[in-house]
Structures are given as structure tokens and as C-alpha cells.
Amino acid sequence: VSGNRVAKTRVTIHASPDEVWNALTRPELVKKYMMGADVKSDWKVGSPLTYTGEYKGKRYEEKGVIKKIEPHKLLQTTHFSTTSGKEDTPENHALVTWELHPKGDATVVAVSQAGIETEKGVEGSQANWNGVLEGLKKTVEGAAS
């Protein structure tokens, strides 16, 4: 992780942490809100995690390693995108943390991405994560209704 800036965003989803967790870890649900990406992992600490797909006509791969996992509560991974234009070295991998907090009959989902080098990078990352969280919310709330 080379940068010291962090992008953070959150959303409240009207569903249980279990339902949200399923949407984070089940490939057929991830595909609905993560720009059509195919996710692969066995969801264990130390295991690889990859998202592959096509964006604006170009193939991409985003990858990382699971650092921490507490089902229905926390998922922390490293993250590297082949579209970043950077070399695939550990210092160019960001750290992404998903936290699920029950709140009544809803779940607050907080996402942070650490290791960003510029304020412009923070803004771009937050916009990206806001879009992902909106899609996650629609996917989960649509499935729950």
C-alpha cells in the first residue's frame, strides 16, 4: 500500500447482515452490482479473490488476497486492478474493508479503501464505491422483497 489516503462510504440496506453477506460472497449476486464481474474465491484467509469482466469493451481483472474474514460482519482484502496502469507489486495493492453493522431490521454497510495516493484518487474511489453500494442495496432489497 503506497498511498496514505482512505476513501470511505456507507449505505443502509433494509435487510439482515446474513442477506447482505450472501450478496458479497455469492457469485450470481456479485455479478448484479459489481459491473457484471465474475468473482472467484473460497472465502478463506490467505486465499486469492478475483473479479473479472468487461468494462467499456475491455477485459479487466481485479484481484487480491483475503486478509480477514468474519462471516456476516467483516471482509478485508487487498485489491489491485489491471486497469490502474501500475505494476502488480504489493505496494500498489490497496486494502479494502467491508464492515456490516446490524441496525434494527437493517444493516449499515461501510466500505473503506486504504492506500490511495491523491485526493483525486479518493474522490474517484468514493464515487466508484458509492455506485457499488447503491447496486448492492438494490440487489439485496430486491431479493428480500
Where are these regions (language model features)?
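Residues at helix-coil transition
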Residues: T25-R26, P71, E141-G142
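Hydrophobic ligand-binding cavity/cleft-lining segments
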Residues: V1-K40
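Extracellular beta-rich ligand/substrate-recognition surface
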Residues: V1-N4, T52, K56
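Hydrophobic-ligand binding "helix-grip"
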Residues: V39-D42, Y55-G104, V108, A114
